[in-house]
């Protein structure tokens, strides 16, 4: 795969906030590095930390990580469909409904970390399998045009966005026992 960042027209305007967070132009390396970093960050936290919310209406740490894994799974599925030449417009999803239905609070943080790792390994396997043409393919997701390359960057940038929120708003606010 040629190392290049997606162009602004390769994704919806709202997605710029995620794409700009990804440093460099080697998306496979960025995804691999994130896998190690994110697993380390969350594995170091207690179950109590996993249940923490910095405000009553906000997701818990577990719910944020679960949301990151669910969103990656959806974006990778979109990338697979588009990479294989499927031109069917792909529907959006309501993130709050997914988080509510997932019941992450009923699961152990370590299990959610493991699921995140499995999802990322699966995404990496998919992206490593693609040829140049597949990376360039364009489809429609949530009513917007997107390329396979852009979806890989959205996975990485979306995770960085949420990790930043966790590190800035959640972890500093967790009361020490």
Predicted regions and their residues:
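Short, contiguous alpha-helical
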Residues: 1-10, 15-17, 50-95, 121-124, ...
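A general boundary/transition motif marking the beginning of the first structured unit of a protein
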Residues: 2-6, 19, 26-27, 67, ...
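Short amphipathic alpha-helical segments at helix-loop
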Residues: 19-23, 60, 101-108, 143-147
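Short, contiguous, helix-prone interaction/anchoring segments in small proteins
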Residues: 20-54
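Amphipathic, non-membrane alpha-helical segments in soluble helical-bundle scaffolds
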Residues: 24-32, 58, 62-65, 109-113, ...
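Acidic/histidine-rich alpha-helical segments that form the ligand environment
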Residues: 30-43, 97-136
